Amino acid sequence: MIKITLKDGKVMEFEEGIKISDIAMKISPALYKKALAAKIDGETVDLMTELHKDSSLEILTFEDEMGKWALRHTGAHILAQAVKRLYPEVKLAIGPAIDTGFYYDFEADFTFTPEMLEKIEAEIKKIIKENHKLERFELPREEAIDLMKEKNEDYKVELIEDLPEGEVISFYKQGDFTDLCAGPHVPSTGKVKSVKLLSLAGAYWRGDENNKMLQRIYGTAFTKKSELDEYLNMLEEAKKRDHRKLGKELDLFSIHEEGPGFPFFHPKGMIIRNILESFWREEHTKAGYQEIRTPLILNEALWHQSGHWDHYKENMYFTNIDDGDYAIKPMNCPGGILVYKNSMHSYRDLPLRLSELGIVHRHELSGALHGLMRVRCFTQDDAHLYMTKEQIKEEIVGIIKLIDKFYKLFGFEYFVELSTRPEDSMGSDEDWEIATNGLREALDSIGKEYRVNEGDGAFYGPKIDFHLKDCIGRTWQCGTIQLDFQMPERFDLSYIGADGEKHRPVMVHRTIYGSVERFIGILIEQYAGAFPTWLAPVQVKLMNITDAQYDYLKKVEEALKENNIRVEIDTRNEKIGYKIREAQLQKIPYMLILGDKEVEAGKVAVRSRKDGDLGAISLEEFIEKIKNEIKVKTN
């Protein structure tokens, strides 16, 4: 008999060799019906996996991230099967699950069309109805290559040949279709209830522009049609809110072919950026942080010492100066560490909180670039905290509270994830255990709900990730707290303890916005470009009906500017209705309309983006109203 520990801590005994699907049935028939995959000792596996030793088990449904992943991974295989049935000469490349669904890349001597997608979708429905079992099998390297050569699948052959010697080479079979795949998958095609093919795109093989351009079909999958319909409605809303479209319409930023992945911020975009950074600085000063600035370019040796060279080299840019090798920083931490090392520190100095709005550069493949969300140059709102082991819990709690304050200001709900040790990591088991427990205890002490993401920590330590949920239900990972015992060791950091001896500090890396650029992109979409008054690049649009009000308009403009209210004037010889419509398209919070009546009464006619026509009030009353709105940062 083997002992299986369930997620709730309950221990059950079963015969050795029992399948996970059978355990799900014994736990509850309702759970068995919803089950899609499982986690065994933190590793995601198929439900048909047999258990031969004592293990911890979590049954995954569509409510779980990896349950969704397994279902959508199977959706990609169903798409490939449908394409091969309809167009047998097409060659298969890769087809993974992604956050929003799945895709598959194909090589074809024709171009897929929207009409073809409809035909493929109809075939997908047939395959789902046929309810084929997904059966995993493994082959030795040469047999695996022969199988794919026999099927004329050149890309699969290349993938197998690139695998390390001794790597397990697995396949999944469903009906008449077999694909190279590590899994996991759901038990049968019938589990994938609702599929929708969404779009077509070009994609270079392996993301390399020197390789052949393939055709990518995107899709998504759900267990219920109602969930699919809700998602499709969200996509329509997301199109209206696309920050790339609104960024252009509202004149906030642009990206040019002379610098792909390097955003250009325009004056209005800079206003938003400066407000976010000023607020960040104010709150960090209140919370006891000291701001630093470190160079963009640092010697290559530093990146070897930090470990970034081994773990991050492919994402870095390099240059040569005075016959020396240098790298443009992809992260701020090594530079921040040099600031710490520049002085001797006593235990009385700790915790030491150093913050930096540091520009970093990371190489992203051209196909992955996406407006402000995925760029090659961005400002990371970093802070690095140095502390004793005894201070870990209190400092982590303080960071969580600061992050919470920021996200609530912008009206974001969020969820928290604790990510544990990855395979590619540095440091001892003991350090990782202390670090992980430190983060866990901080979360538990303030009653913050979280889920555990096994194996997704940074290479130098475990982390807490904060995922924002926007107003249309999408999630964005922004803030992070990473506990690090490794960097202090690598850089021989120390402080003098109460005993007069040298001790090693604990280091914490953390961000709140994550990337300032990306956070602005998220805000553009969160507000659909209609920023709250305190954040709006233009807070008031001032317009006259005829030239007769021009002198009064200039006096009103001057009064607004004296009160630090951002105002634009529209004195064009256009109909007032046209001016109003244009200001509405620019999503400006307030319009002040001046006609002869307003001049005579010394008032302003106020039109609010939110509440419509507010009538005529004194200029002093309006200034008091808007200043209060800005002060309290009303959303």
Swiss-Prot record:
The protein's matches in Pfam families, at most eight in alphabetical order, are given as: HGTP_anticodon, TGS, tRNA-synt_2b, tRNA_SAD
The segments labelled Catalytic in the record are 242-532
Q: Protein name, please?
A: Threonine--tRNA ligase
Q: What does the record give under GO molecular function?
A: ATP binding; catalytic activity, acting on a protein; metal ion binding; threonine-tRNA ligase activity; transferase activity; tRNA binding
Query: Which cofactors does the annotated protein need, by name?
Result: Zn(2+)
List cellular component terms (GO).
Answer: cytoplasm
Q: How is the cofactor bound?
A: Binds 1 zinc ion per subunit.
Binding, Zn(2+): C333, H384, H509
InterPro entries per record: aa-tRNA-synt_IIb (IPR002314), aa-tRNA-synth_II (IPR006195), aa-tRNA-synth_II/BPL/LPL (IPR045864), Anticodon-bd (IPR004154), Anticodon-bd_dom_sf (IPR036621), Beta-grasp_dom_sf (IPR012675), TGS (IPR004095), TGS-like (IPR012676)
